[in-house]
């Protein structure tokens, strides 16, 4: 059973039902809907397709709705592109104007208040670099071109040294969030997170709608890297969004930041997605480059919960082949023993000390006796997250009467969730779920399995029971 999950961005190449079915059957675990593109009608149609396929295949593929965030862009250029010359002076205006080699506009009105002399402005993913000479703090910034080149219309702008004051959620994001919550999407990706406060604000909006969507904090700003300890406490999951991150921080720092964020996620039992350019050459090619194979492999070895595809599956020539290829790499890496057994002793002063201790000892016992699987009953999904964070070699099966977490758990390393709502007795439940797994050939007669539950079984309290037994 594959443990590291695969997230794929959907688009024109992967929206047809039969294409998506093949992706489901070849290892896809989470469908990402990118709100930067497409209409609500298109998104609603693909969400319906995902849910139909879950019914038809018996899988629980999750849906991640990715909010665009406050993307700052240049305005329109004369003849669609202009050349900025090294050493020349260029004016940036917040007033709309046709861009030339000496001036262009930007879509963020408060930028002149935010920037200071000496700070750098990066254009088109860092291909062009400007330095702020002065600002009138109203509508105009004077810059010097440090590294010139061709600047096209509507290109992204990054500010590696500047604290931007614009809100984390734009008006478009709020509309997209309303749609996502209305559609009961499992995970919400929050772009350009700068601090834990951004997560708290989004959670408040989700709670106001009385929804249970979980939050992925996309780490792509230097401020987020600095505040990672507070962010990881507030969020439900993390994404190492290496595209903008690699522009805003020195690119040579990204691999170590990736490893650090994955370790934080494991420490706090929060899933981590590694994203951007993982197999980008497969947008057009039938096989990945060797560097891409190593990139995916290293994310798995680092301990990522999931690896993500973007253009490869949204607009690529063969999205099914991309899923198959990534699935093959992931499974091969999971044969390496070094990715398992990351148990951390539970802290006695934690509110969930008893549950954490049960999970810790289940994983430790599983290693000692070579248990085939750890089976847990959970209403909130907490034990699934906690057990997964300890990276046991045993398979992890979560049984729940809470349908909302069935798909959410599909993002979590090693976890497979099943709907189960019988509560006759603890012994009956343990025997019954072993029988169900045996029927699906996920465990076999003679396998050792570990069961976790709360007693009495009908309560949704802390897990306080651990049982080791054979499958009969």
State where each predicted segment sits.
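Non-catalytic helical/linker scaffolds that mediate oligomerization, partner binding
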Residues: 1-472
